[in-house]
């Protein structure tokens, strides 16, 4: 009866209120099998059947509706659910907090992708209602504690360049595009608690009036427009290579996408000093930066490029209309 009640409500909301879809909380609990904290993430075939039934109802009612699961189970189960059409939350908070703070340890981005998971299966996120804000951690820990807002926002822009260019769905948590830096432990009365809480946090529309936060906002906007204008370049088949592990910190991180006719290269510097590096482009000729400047590539396998501190450069083999 409970399942029937929930499914009938989902159908009603989709038809009557035109919902775009649903995000179900802690779906590893959608089972009749007993488990504990250490076993709940193990593959549960009965849970897979239940969730597929839910998705069938949603998909039959509206084929375009999205069903997102906060699942956090083993890859074999998540992969099967993703192949059925569902999307699963994927937590990248630690990696992007570390890079956002200018700390190389535990900052590997490569966990965003897995050969056993469809590219559209994981909804990667840097922040959520359960996780600490990257911009807050910049002010409290790491190598940017004493940096100015201009530098911190540039670092967050470099984070975004290695987040939004990766094929697959992404979640941007509220005001992350403006560098929201109130802690998850901030309380409604204006004091700082000692634990995560869901108290209402200040709504900071005034961030848009700050030139550095607006600059971060514009970076997000530009990257998202690039994705929307060039879906072929951000499909899973277009993903060619990236070097985003801890060992790639000192010489700059790198990502390359390539569709039938379009190419994109991102190079990022998360350090507090300029780096000079050699970049693989794949072909010589003119490449275009997001700011409209042109780079004439003469060495396709190791073109010298200078990346300022806390910055990124994104190149395409076609002019980008911003």
Name these PLM-found stretches.
Residues 26-126, 161-165, 176-262, 270-285, ...:
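Active-site-proximal helices and loops of the catalytic beta/alpha 8
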Residues 299-322:
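C-terminal beta-strand-rich structural cap/linker in extracellular carbohydrate-active enzymes
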Residues 129-131:
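Extended catalytic-interface subdomain
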Residues 137-160:
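Aromatic-anchored helix/helix-loop segment that forms the rim or "lid"
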Residues 1-15, 156-160:
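Short, acidic/polar
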Residues 7-37:
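Active-site groove signature of glycoside hydrolases
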Residues 289-302:
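Solvent-exposed beta-strand/loop surfaces of large extracellular or lumenal domains
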């Amino acid at each position: 009866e409970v399942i029937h009640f929930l499914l009938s409500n989902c159908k009603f909301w989709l038809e009557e209120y035109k919902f775009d879809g649903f995000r179900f909380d802690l779906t590893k609990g959608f089972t009749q099998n007993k488990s504990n904290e250490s076993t709940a993430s193990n593959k549960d075939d009965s849970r897979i059947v239940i969730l597929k039934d839910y998705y069938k109802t949603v998909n039959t009612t509206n084929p375009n509706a999205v069903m997102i699961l906060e699942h956090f189970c083993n890859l074999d189960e998540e992969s099967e659910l993703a192949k059925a059409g569902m999307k699963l939350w994927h937590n990248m908070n630690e990696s992007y907090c570390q890079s956002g703070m200018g700390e190389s340890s535990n900052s590997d981005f490569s966990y965003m992708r897995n050969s056993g998971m469809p590219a559209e299966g994981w909804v990667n996120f840097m922040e959520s209602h359960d996780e600490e804000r990257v911009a807050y951690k910049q002010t409290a820990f790491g190598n940017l504690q004493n940096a100015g807002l201009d530098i911190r926002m540039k670092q967050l822009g470099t984070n975004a360049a290695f987040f939004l260019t990766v094929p697959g769905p992404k979640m941007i948590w509220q005001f992350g595009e403006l560098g929201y830096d109130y802690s998850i432990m901030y309380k409604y009365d204006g004091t700082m608690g000692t634990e995560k809480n869901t108290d209402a946090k200040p709504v900071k529309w005034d961030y848009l009036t700050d030139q550095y936060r607006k600059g971060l906002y514009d970076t997000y906007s530009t990257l998202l427009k690039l994705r929307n204008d060039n879906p072929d370049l951000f499909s899973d088949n277009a993903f060619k290579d990236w070097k985003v592990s801890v060992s790639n910190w000192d010489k700059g991180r790198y990502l390359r996408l390539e569709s039938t006719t379009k190419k994109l290269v991102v190079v990022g510097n998360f350090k507090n000093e300029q780096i000079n590096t050699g970049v693989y482009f794949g072909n010589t000729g003119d490449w275009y930066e997001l700011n409209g400047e042109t780079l004439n590539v003469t060495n396709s396998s190791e073109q010298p490029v200078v990346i300022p501190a806390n910055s990124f450069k994104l190149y395409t083999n076609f002019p980008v209309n911003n």
